[in-house]
């Protein structure tokens, strides 16, 4: 598989009309995140309420329809696709879509990857590798099994560890994602860093984002990563490096471990100026920005005709509405989310 990780790998040949999707601010849209389901087998406190109401299954696009949509985006210049959720691996027959997309690697698509909570990885790791998946993100906010249960509500820490083991054994590279939560896991980040780097994994820490009504108070959870970095620099030597994965993280090298640590800071230092992505939901709704409510309905165009001309027109129109930046802000006055939909709808 050709990869686009850092400066390694060779990108697949590009057509003469490569990167035809250019937004109003001159940014090429080359990255599609596909939320294949809003359902999850965890109920992480910063992501969703414990008693969630999920989309009726009849409202979901079929996997064949999602494949067709992804193919349309690849034809329009998308080079990287990430499957997300909810938890993508709980979608019934999800490996069908993975297999179909895997066939497009080297034929327009450079990379297929996914973000997962790890709970289903032990069952799917080998097949993911066989389909061309070479790296994944695993969400892990703590190494303490009791705290893990508290934050995920329903999660089994041992199953996630089994999944990480299985993925690494299969040859898949892993990046751990940890949401930094004040008073909960901020003191644990050094341990997460050592754990990740000790197993050859990158670690990225993320500021909590104000999306959807949850049971917790985000104003209590929010931790600026500038503060976290200052605390880490009391223990580690952090050197800024020019390392890119196509995402918003800014990376440092941890001299004591030799590993990489990423910071995703939507609240304190947004990454909008280099945004190269759009987000497709399992119902065919396209969000041009994670932190805005504007969206385009692609399902109608998809189902109107078997020809893709109308679909391509709908995609083009949507890209013209991609905003300059998001509207994230922690509202300490009213304690309400900046965006009403939950993270599980658009997949981060």
Swiss-Prot record:
Residues 24-242 form the Radical SAM core domain. [4Fe-4S] cluster 1 binds at residues 40, 44, 47. The keyword Transferase does not apply. GO terms for molecular function: 4 iron, 4 sulfur cluster binding; cyclic pyranopterin monophosphate synthase activity; GTP 3',8'-cyclase activity; GTP binding; metal ion binding; S-adenosyl-L-methionine binding. S-adenosyl-L-methionine binds at residues 46, 86, 139, 209. It holds the Pfam family Fer4_12. It catalyses: GTP + AH2 + S-adenosyl-L-methionine = (8S)-3',8-cyclo-7,8-dihydroguanosine 5'-triphosphate + 5'-deoxyadenosine + L-methionine + A + H(+). Its EC number is 4.1.99.22. Its cofactor is [4Fe-4S] cluster. GTP binds at residues 33, 82, 115, 175, 277-279. [4Fe-4S] cluster 2 binds at residues 272, 275, 289. GO terms for biological process: Mo-molybdopterin cofactor biosynthetic process. Keywords: 4Fe-4S, GTP-binding, Iron, Iron-sulfur, Lyase, Metal-binding, Molybdenum cofactor biosynthesis, Nucleotide-binding, S-adenosyl-L-methionine. Disulfide bonds: none annotated. PANTHER family: MOLYBDENUM COFACTOR BIOSYNTHESIS PROTEIN 1, MOLYBDOPTERIN COFACTOR SYNTHESIS PROTEIN A. HAMAP family: MoaA_B. Monomer and homodimer. Catalyzes the cyclization of GTP to (8S)-3',8-cyclo-7,8-dihydroguanosine 5'-triphosphate. Belongs to the radical SAM superfamily. MoaA family. This is GTP 3',8-cyclase. The gene is moaA.
């Amino acid at each position: 598989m050709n990869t686009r990780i850092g400066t390694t790998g060779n990108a697949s040949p590009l057509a003469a009309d490569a990167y035809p999707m250019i937004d109003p601010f001159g940014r090429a849209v080359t990255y599609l995140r596909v939320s294949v389901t809003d359902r999850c087998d965890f109920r992480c406190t910063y992501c969703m309420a414990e008693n969630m109401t999920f989309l009726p299954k009849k409202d979901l696009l079929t996997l064949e329809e999602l494949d067709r949509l992804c193919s349309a985006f690849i034809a329009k210049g998308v080079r990287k696709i990430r499957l997300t959720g909810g938890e993508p691996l709980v979608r019934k027959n999800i490996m069908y879509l993975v297999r179909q997309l895997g066939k497009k690697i080297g034929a327009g698509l450079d990379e297929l990857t996914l973000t997962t909570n790890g709970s289903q990885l032990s069952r799917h790791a080998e097949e993911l590798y066989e389909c061309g998946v070479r790296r994944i993100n695993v969400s892990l906010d703590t190494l303490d099994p009791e705290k893990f249960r508290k934050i995920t509500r329903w999660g089994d820490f041992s199953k996630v560890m089994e999944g990480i083991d299985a993925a690494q054994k299969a040859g898949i590279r892993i990046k751990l994602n940890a949401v930094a939560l004040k008073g909960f896991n901020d003191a644990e980040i050094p341990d997460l860093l050592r754990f990740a780097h000790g197993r050859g994994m990158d670690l990225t820490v993320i500021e909590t984002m104000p999306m959807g009504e949850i049971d917790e108070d985000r104003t209590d959870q929010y931790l600026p990563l500038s503060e976290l970095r200052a605390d880490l620099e009391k223990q580690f030597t952090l050197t800024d490096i020019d390392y890119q994965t196509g995402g918003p993280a800014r990376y440092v090298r941890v001299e004591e471990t030799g590993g990489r640590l990423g910071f995703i800071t939507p609240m304190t230092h947004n990454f909008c100026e280099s945004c190269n992505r759009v987000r497709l939901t399992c119902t065919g709704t396209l969000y041009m920005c994670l932190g805005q409510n504007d969206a385009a309905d692609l399902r109608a165009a998809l189902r109107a005709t078997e020809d893709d001309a109308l679909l391509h027109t709908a995609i083009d129109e949507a890209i013209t509405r991609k905003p300059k930046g998001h509207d994230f802000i922690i509202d300490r006055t009213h304690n309400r989310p900046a965006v009403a939909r939950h993270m599980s709808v658009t997949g981060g």
